[in-house]
């Protein structure tokens, strides 16, 4: 290659002019939403909106009561409580997403200050990557990241890993037009920003920088907001609409019913009094608004937030860094996972899968001469090196296939560096596609300085150069062996050697190897092995009713073989289940729509093939998760319901994703699905618990409205039940661990209402029973002077004298303890187990204890604020014991169902 002095490069003035004209070499980051706007976005939740409306109504009524009716300031407790509930819920959601994004930014830091060798004003200098401009002459070599899109001026054995852009791990680059690859995604004489030099070196002229590069264009495309509504959001929208409609209907019924009652009851009275009617109508409207407020589950947003936040933190421990809170639950609704191959299904590390050296017993290098020749041949006839800074997990620098051979030596406790230093290379013949082999003549360190020719390349070509073979393996036997390797999508290399005598010529620059007495040493098969945990993880997803599709830049044969190894591809699959990128692009939208569910593999996929696949699956009603680690994956990651980037993926891919798989393993995706499904069930359990409370409370307000009595539960007591206690309940149910049994179920129907048939029955029946029990207890307390629950059976009912603070304490505690025991039933819902199955439920039990202690403290110390008075110990025992019947009936029902 020409020396760098042949190029003058740009002058300082030309650099500034180019930067002014074409911009800087930095990808413009997506415009960050201001913190205040991100916080306000949390108020777009439909349940939050209902709460805010209810809070405003409640505040107006409180103002009227305080200023118009001269009531105490305690009337403001209810609106304050509602607004506190809103702020707690939105604040927590904002905090946890902010924390996750901070962790993500640390993970996704991009270094634009990496030094790059350029030629400017005739000198070779190093400048930061961000200072590269269009027109710069850049020098690139093995291990370098390409800083910008450029055209090659010179190249020597240049191989580039373009997998981040095209999915192709090894692309040969050349300036010789005759050697251009007609099927290559990008011209063979172009190198692209974000790709990496795997072997060789070259000089190139920069054509585009920053946003104008191919990486920049894909990054910009990934910023288009293709967000879709998540399944959980859809369900909460439906729930909020249901609650709104029911509360409005009840409010209208109360107003109409009470107005009718007024006229019916007042028909015999003397005349019609507008002042009395206005006062009555105002109190009726206040009762109607109270129903609206009571009907809204104040604790639900908090429950959802806590459940999502808890799952976010726990999922991080299992290799899932969740950036967007909704993605936790959406993973549970996933019906299709579109995954790439390299690095997710496989280890992204070329490895010697099988060695076939006849002279090696058990294919282990020994102390014999053949072993020494094999080891030296691999070490010296190679362009790759190893980074041994981590001796346990060395990494390859250079060609991954050649690096796999050095790793094999390393695993056999042979140091390739010692072998290289012990020999002297005399002549080299680089690898060329037309020859399909490379060769080197060395003064051997293992044969006391004798000249030895080593040849490595395509086994069938290397074997044809040989006069004999170790072990007398025939050509037919070799071909049969190679066919078996090819069926397994493995790359193969053959090895040969010859000890040269005197001045015997072994290599000719034009004709290649000219030696006539080569001995074939053997063959190795190299592959990127499947991760050990992937087959089981894929089987788990398939058992869970989740379809898995492979989208890769590899050949159809390689993709199908990987599919076979992980249990995704079998003999029963036909051509309809596999397609190449160009074929997929040629299909019409109607043809893709018809075929997309049957597809298992898209091979030779291009950047937008995966995005089109995702969009079509979504049109068919599928909930789609997509994995990707390359810049080319960003549009699909952004489009999918859940985008899953890999921890060692590009910054562009991670920026477009919702979850980053920090350990790069497909099995982590299976765990995310399990968490998502369990999370949805936990939210269902809380809704079951919360709505039972609300149904009972609504019935109480309704009964009071038509019977002309006040609610037996004060505003502050209802705040404890609906806000504080429900928040603790949300924490308790959110802390329930994920259940592996959910992976045996099929994905839930995203259109199925979050309150299923069983929940509806339990809410209405349980809420109705609680109401009747409470109504009966209130009736007894109103019509008798209850001083101790031990005397309840001997009480005489009278005409009614109102409720004392002691009786209010009994009623309040009675209602709370009914909900307390019902939480056990809610926890057992969907488990098929007893409510006493407490495995991994320490947090649940602790929070229940906090609720019980809190109730005791409020009744004992709450005084006038809560309209309560301390209860004797025997009354506590009676209340706790009597209300526990809720749990025992639930246990009997579960036992009967079993």
Regions found by a protein language model. Name each.
Residues 1-747, 752-755, 768, 812, ...:
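Conserved cytosolic headpiece of P-type ATPases
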Residues 67-69, 762-777:
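Alpha-helical transmembrane segments of multi-pass integral membrane proteins
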Residues 133, 381, 771-783, 817, ...:
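Short hydrophobic alpha-helical module
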Residues 705-714, 780-807:
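Helix-coil boundary and interhelical linker segments in multi-pass alpha-helical membrane proteins
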Residues 725, 806-824:
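Generic alpha-helical transmembrane segments
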């Amino acid at each position: 290659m020409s020396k760098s002095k042949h190029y003058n490069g740009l002058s300082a003035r030309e650099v500034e002019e180019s930067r002014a004209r074409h911009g800087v070499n930095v990808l413009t980051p997506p415009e960050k939403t201001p913190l205040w706007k991100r916080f306000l976005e949390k108020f777009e939740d439909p349940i939050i909106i209902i709460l805010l409306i209810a809070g405003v109504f409640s505040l107006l009524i409180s103002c009227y009561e305080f200023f118009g009716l001269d009531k105490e300031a305690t009337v403001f407790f209810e609106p304050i409580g509602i607004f506190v509930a809103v702020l707690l819920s939105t604040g927590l959601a904002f905090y946890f997403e902010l924390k996750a994004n901070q962790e993500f930014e640390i993970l996704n830091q991009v270094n634009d200050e990496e030094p790059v060798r350029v030629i400017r004003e005739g000198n070779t200098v190093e400048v930061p990557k961000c200072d590269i401009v269009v027109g710069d002459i850049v020098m690139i070599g093995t291990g370098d990241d390409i800083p910008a899109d450029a055209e090659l001026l010179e190249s020597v054995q240049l191989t580039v890993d373009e997998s981040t852009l095209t999915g192709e791990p090894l692309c040969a680059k050349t300036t010789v037009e005759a050697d251009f690859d007609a099927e290559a995604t990008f011209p063979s004489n172009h190198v692209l920003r974000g790709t990496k030099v795997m072997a060789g070196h070259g000089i190139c002229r920069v054509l585009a920088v920053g946003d104008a590069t191919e990486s920049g264009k894909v990054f910009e495309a990934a910023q288009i907001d293709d967000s879709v509504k998540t399944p959980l959001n859809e369900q909460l929208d439906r729930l909020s609409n249901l609650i709104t409609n029911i509360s409005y209907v009840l409010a209208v019924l109360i107003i109409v019913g009470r107005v009718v009652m007024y006229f019916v009851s007042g028909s015999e009275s003397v005349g019609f009094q507008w002042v009395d009617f206005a006062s009555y109508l105002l109190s009726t409207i206040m009762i109607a608004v109270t129903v609206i407020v009571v009907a809204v589950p104040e604790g639900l947003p908090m429950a959802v937030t806590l459940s999502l936040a808890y799952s976010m933190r726990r999922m991080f421990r299992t290799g899932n860094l969740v950036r967007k809170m909704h993605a936790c639950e959406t993973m549970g609704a996933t019906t299709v996972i579109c995954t790439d191959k390299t690095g997710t299904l496989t280890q992204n590390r070329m490895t010697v899968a099988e060695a076939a050296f006849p002279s090696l017993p058990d294919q282990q290098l020994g102390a014999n001469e053949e072993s020494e020749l094999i080891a030296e041949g691999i070490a010296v006839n190679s362009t790759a090196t190893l980074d041994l800074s981590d001796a346990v997990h060395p990494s390859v620098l250079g060609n991954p296939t050649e690096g796999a051979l050095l790793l094999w030596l390393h695993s056999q406790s042979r140091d390739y560096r010692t072998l290289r230093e012990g020999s002297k290379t005399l002549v080299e013949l680089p690898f060329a596609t037309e020859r399909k082999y490379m060769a080197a003549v060395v003064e051997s360190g293992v044969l006391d300085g004798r000249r030895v020719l080593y040849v490595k390349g395509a086994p069938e070509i290397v074997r044809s150069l040989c006069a004999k073979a170790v072990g007398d393996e025939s050509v037919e036997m070799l071909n049969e062996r190679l066919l078996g390797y090819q069926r397994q999508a493995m790359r193969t290399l053959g090895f040969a050697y010859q000890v040269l005598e005197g001045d015997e010529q072994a290599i000719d620059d034009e004709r290649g190897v000219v030696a006539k007495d080569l001995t074939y040493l053997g063959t190795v098969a190299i592959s990127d092995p499947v991760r050990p945990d992937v087959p089981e993880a894929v089987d788990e997803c398939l058992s869970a009713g989740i379809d898995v599709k492979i989208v890769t830049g590899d050949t159809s044969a390689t993709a199908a073989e990987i599919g076979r190894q992980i249990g995704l591809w079998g003999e029963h699959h036909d051509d309809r289940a596999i397609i190449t990128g160009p074929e997929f692009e040629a299909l019409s939208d109607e043809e893709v729509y018809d075929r997309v569910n049957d597809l298992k593999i898209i091979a030779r996929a291009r950047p937008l093939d995966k995005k089109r696949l995702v969009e079509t699956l979504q049109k068919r009603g599928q909930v789609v998760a997509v994995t990707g680690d390359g810049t080319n994956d960003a549009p699909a990651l952004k489009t999918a319901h859940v985008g899953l980037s890999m921890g060692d993926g590009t910054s562009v891919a991670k920026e477009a994703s919702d979850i980053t798989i920090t350990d790069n393993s497909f099995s982590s995706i299976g765990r995310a699905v399990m968490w998502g499904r369990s999370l949805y069930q936990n939210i269902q359990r809380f809704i079951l618990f919360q709505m039972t409370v609300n149904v009972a409370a609504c019935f109480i307000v309704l009964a009071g409205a038509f019977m002309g009595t006040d609610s037996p539960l004060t505003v502050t007591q209802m705040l404890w039940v609906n806000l504080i206690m429900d928040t603790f309940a949300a924490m308790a149910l959110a802390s329930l661990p994920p259940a592996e049994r959910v992976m045996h179920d099929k994905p839930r129907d995203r259109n199925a209402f979050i309150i299923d048939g069983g929940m509806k029955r339990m809410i209405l029946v349980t809420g109705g029973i609680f109401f009747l029990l409470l109504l009966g207890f209130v009736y007894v307390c109103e019509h008798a002077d209850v001083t101790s629950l031990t005397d309840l059976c001997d009480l005489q009912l009278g005409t009614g004298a109102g409720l004392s603070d002691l009786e209010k304490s009994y009623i309040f505690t009675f209602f709370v303890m009914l909900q307390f025991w019902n939480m056990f039933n809610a926890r057992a819902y969907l488990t098929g187990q007893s409510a006493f199955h407490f495995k991994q439920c320490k947090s649940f039990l602790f929070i229940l204890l906090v609720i019980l202690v809190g109730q005791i403290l409020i009744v004992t110390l709450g005084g006038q604020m809560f309209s309560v008075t301390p209860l004797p110990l025997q009354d506590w025992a009676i209340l706790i014991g009597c209300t526990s019947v809720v749990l025992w009936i639930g246990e009997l029902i579960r036992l009967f169902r079993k």
